[in-house]
Amino acid sequence: MIKMKIVNSILLIITLALVTSCSNNMKPEDFKNTKPSLLIEEYFDGKVKAWGILQDRGGKVTRQFKADLVGSFKDNVITLDEDFYWTDGEKQKRTWKIKKIDDNNYVGTAPDVVGEASGAQYGSAFKFKYDLMVPFKNKNIKISFDDWIFKQDEKVAINRATLTKFGFKVGELTVFFMRY
């Protein structure tokens, strides 16, 4: 009986290791020749509307939102004010400060981001990695975001984010952006 539990535990650990090692290995550089080019300092300079869904690790939609974003670019820094309106009535506000380091790299901060976010832009894609303090059951927990934005045309961009905790996927976020 004990040997069977040990074997089952080992099989579970191996399975989890295999599943987590099959993670997405896309790199921003993979998109260097794609069009239309996404420069976030241009795309988010002005007003942008957003609509999004949050899914749990099984794919079930757990929350939906609309958002108003207003950005400005000055002295190599994007200030992006985000106002979220969740369908359950919750309202959230976040202000990003994203600094352009060179032609392709960025760092960003926001009050609920732990440390600095790191970003890279190539072609039509922008990747942004950060840890966010998220409200959960009357406390805040740290969730890691692996965020990708893909520009579709001059007005439309699509955002896909994988959310992880301790390296395990806990959810996905899909956002549709429209400049106006």
Where are the predicted features?
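Bacterial signal peptide processing site
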Residues: 23-25
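A short, Trp-centered hydrophobic/proline-enriched beta-strand micro-motif
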Residues: 44-52, 159
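C-terminal motif of bacterial Sec signal peptides marking the signal peptidase cleavage site
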Residues: 18-21
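N-terminal helix-cap/turn-to-beta initiation motif at the start of protein domains
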Residues: 31-47
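Glycine-rich, aromatic-bearing surface loops/beta-hairpins
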Residues: 146-147, 151-180
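Central antiparallel beta-sheet cores of small beta-barrel/beta-sandwich binding domains
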Residues: 51, 55-136
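Amphipathic hydrophobic-ligand
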Residues: 61-67, 140-145, 169-173
